[in-house]
Amino acid sequence: MKETSEDNPDPEDKSTDDTDSILKVITRRKWGAQASRTPKKQRLKHPVNFVRFLDTTTDADSYEDCSEYMKEVQKFRMFTGDTDIPYNFVVGSDSLVYEGVGWKVEVDRPLKLRYLLGDCLDIAFIGDLEDGFMPSSEMFKAAIDVIKYGIEKNYISPTYLQLPLDGWRPSYFLKPHR
């Protein structure tokens, strides 16, 4: 995975140090993340068997707006008691991939989704489905690149199950076809 910024701020998480990949990620340092409060035990077990897709229910149209969104959602979630941003990765309206908590950390989950603990990667699209948002083909491609990279590096099982939002059917678009 090719970084678009300096080293990852978490010295134990080398999730963005693979320079031989086509996947480009805006690292936590690049978008201005605060230090995570996630306990070291809150880790994903690889390869994960589930990938969940979400919308952020917000809009951001540029790199600057997307970076600002990442900072604001992290700040709000940490203020309300979560340990960090609630996504592993976020695909911006600018079609760039932003590192949330990355490949190795479990996001904070609501009680009804506790069955996914340790076994699910969350990828969010910046946008609001209730306002008629549909990810662009470039955003879908960025999400597919995340999945392909995850499978290649054994972060995601090649037989993973995709968990789409209610009423949203991205399955055809997001399963990497070989």
Where are these regions (language model features)?
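Cell-envelope and extracellular/periplasmic
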Residues: 8-62, 116-135, 151
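Short, conserved "active-site rim" segments that organize catalytic pockets and cofactor/ligand binding
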Residues: 25-106
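Acidic/histidine-rich, metal-coordinating catalytic segments
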Residues: 56, 92, 157-178
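Long, well-ordered alpha-helical scaffolding segments within enzyme catalytic domains
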Residues: 63-84, 117-169
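Short, surface-exposed glycine/acidic/tryptophan-bearing loops
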Residues: 102-118, 122
